Amino acid sequence: MVWVLSSWQIVAERYPLLGETVTVGTQPYEFRSFMGFRNFVMEDEAGKRIAYANSLFSLIDIETAHPMRPTEEMLEKYVLGEKIQMDYAPRKITIPDGAVKGEEILILPHHLDVNHHVNNGQYVRIAMDCVPKGLKIRQLRVEYKKQVRLHEVLVPYVSRTET
């Protein structure tokens, strides 16, 4: 069995400065069925939160590729923390009206991880290539629907929201 990242939401109040000392922490806050929920926090030296995230992981049976519930023994090993204060977006992302279809991306070997599918971080890099250079991203949401493999094609859709 393996925990697989299903979705995440990252909020950056500000970006850390080059050489700035920051503290990063993470803690699970809930388990429901085959899903595990985890928060991440980045703080500056004064303890002020500068970035934070929410994530959803699914426990997958490696043999069947189906979701499975964690055992009581597994759950006992986790120390649950408090859910952090943030504006939690819905888990599923709806493509907004007016989103523009981007240029198709052929998946190449450098996009892949050790499991031979696109690495989580590569999806973000691909998405960042679709937005104007120099744009400061303050919030990022990612939803993984299926594994993408070598020589498959990703089709990005781009939409900008003013905040």
Which role does the model predict for each range below?
Residues 1, 119-137:
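Active-site helix/loop of acyl-thioester processing domains in fatty-acid/polyketide metabolism
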Residues 7-94, 144-153, 159-163:
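HotDog/MaoC-like acyl-thioester-processing domains
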